[in-house]
């Protein structure tokens, strides 16, 4: 019963986040925790009880902390199962592959404890945050056939990133696709270099254009485009498509921030 109540608290406590955070960050809440698509972190809370046979109070607390951390990391994997990867693949499907699951579990060593609560009965509640950046996102993305990027016409762009404003309902995913009117892909997993994918995935999300332009991923001089939601893809009109085709370097570096529509 205690663990069940605490798993609810792990999500409910996030609702009370500061107003500025809630207004700017795109957060997906799940049964076991949350995904901050702006910071690209997964947050979950775990609980640990002290062993009955501990030799002293200090040993009991250390073991309770270890158990709470292990429980929280297990919940991180459950959160990842609820993450959308691309149009046809979800986190649960990717993590059903043993190799992918073991690699993801190995990345959980990079999780950091954010808060710990020590209860009167010796139990510990611990909240951990695990970065999707630095490899975890790359592990979750499906295998991709090698593609040679198309040459970019015209002089190099002075823009440092692309801010994509979405019109219409759209949910975050690790590998969004932006297509033109003919269905040709303008941006997606194949557009981003492997080093950039390992560094920080393919995209970040925010809830306002101002925060997207201030995001480190956008750089100092991003260009903005508007697209519309088209089911599992984002549709760029002729003007937006032309801009995207001219931003080859920014796209290859994954310097894309998507502004989600207001709920």
Locate the predicted segments by residue.
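N-terminal signal peptide c-region/cleavage motif recognized by signal peptidases
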Residues: 16-17
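Cleavable N-terminal signal peptides
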Residues: 9-10, 20
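Domain-level marker for long, solvent-exposed, non-transmembrane regions
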Residues: 21-263
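Bacterial N-terminal signal peptides that target proteins for export
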Residues: 1-9
């Amino acid at each position: 019963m205690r663990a069940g109540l605490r798993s609810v608290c792990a999500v409910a406590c996030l609702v009370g986040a500061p107003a500025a955070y809630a207004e700017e960050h795109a957060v997906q809440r799940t049964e076991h925790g949350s995904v901050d698509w702006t910071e690209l972190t997964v947050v979950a809370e775990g609980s640990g009880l002290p062993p009955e046979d501990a030799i002293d109070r200090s040993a009991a607390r250390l073991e309770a902390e270890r158990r709470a951390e292990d429980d929280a990391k297990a919940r991180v994997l459950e959160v990842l199962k609820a993450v959308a990867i691309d149009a046809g693949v979800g986190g649960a499907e990717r993590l059903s592959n043993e190799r992918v699951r073991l690699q993801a579990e190995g990345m959980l060593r990079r999780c950091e404890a954010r808060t710990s609560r020590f209860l009167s009965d010796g139990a510990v509640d611990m909240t951990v945050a695990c970065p999707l950046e630095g490899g975890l996102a790359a592990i979750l993305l499906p295998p991709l056939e090698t593609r040679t990027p198309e040459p970019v016409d015209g002089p190099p762009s002075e823009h440092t990133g692309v801010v994509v404003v979405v019109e219409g309902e759209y949910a975050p995913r690790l590998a969004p696709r932006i297509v033109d009117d003919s269905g040709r892909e303008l941006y997606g997993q194949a557009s981003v270099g492997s080093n950039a994918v390992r560094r920080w995935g393919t995209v970040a999300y925010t809830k306002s254009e101002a925060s997207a332009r201030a995001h480190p991923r956008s750089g100092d001089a991003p260009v903005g485009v508007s697209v519309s939601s088209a089911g599992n893809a984002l549709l760029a009109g002729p003007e937006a498509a032309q801009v995207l085709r001219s931003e080859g370097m920014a796209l290859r570096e994954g310097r894309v921030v998507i502004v989600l529509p207001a709920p």
